[in-house]
């Protein structure tokens, strides 16, 4: 891994008063989602859990992790964790979402392919959560990408 991207996105469905928040890490090399966390609250624990899942291997030294300027990514404990792993933090310019275009693009694909137009079909947050888990598996292991020469993200890495 050389450059990875992260952010948090929100899902709301009519069947629930609560929302679901997805916090993934996307590998810039092959667009694979290498870790993610789903939570009903966009809190620091969600981001910490996602980071611990993403950066347990030895392949992260000299990695740059890019995010927007969300409060989670400005927190001291976030920066301490990255420093402890030898990961360099990078942040978008304030109010400039194109700086985090790879992550925003993934969110757009995810929501257009499995969420927008289907919101009413999810009867619970658990059902939505499972649909997101299934989609990320599909995205990493079955969905071909033209920019990866017609391969899926997992194949392209090997």
Segments from the language model and where they lie:
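Hydrophobic (often cysteine-bearing) scaffold residues that line and stabilize catalytic clefts
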Residues: 1, 22, 43, 47, ...
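Mobile-element integrase/transposase regions
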Residues: 1-24, 48-49, 60-62
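Active-site beta-loop-alpha junctions of metal-dependent nucleic acid enzymes
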Residues: 18, 36-58
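Short, acidic, Ser/Thr-enriched surface-loop or helix-capping motifs
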Residues: 27-28
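Generic alpha-helical structural context detector
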Residues: 52, 80, 104-108, 112, ...
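RNase H-like two-metal-ion nuclease catalytic core shared by retroviral integrases
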Residues: 67-69, 75-76, 89-111, 126-129, ...
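C-terminal domain-tail junction helix/linker
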Residues: 83-87, 111-158
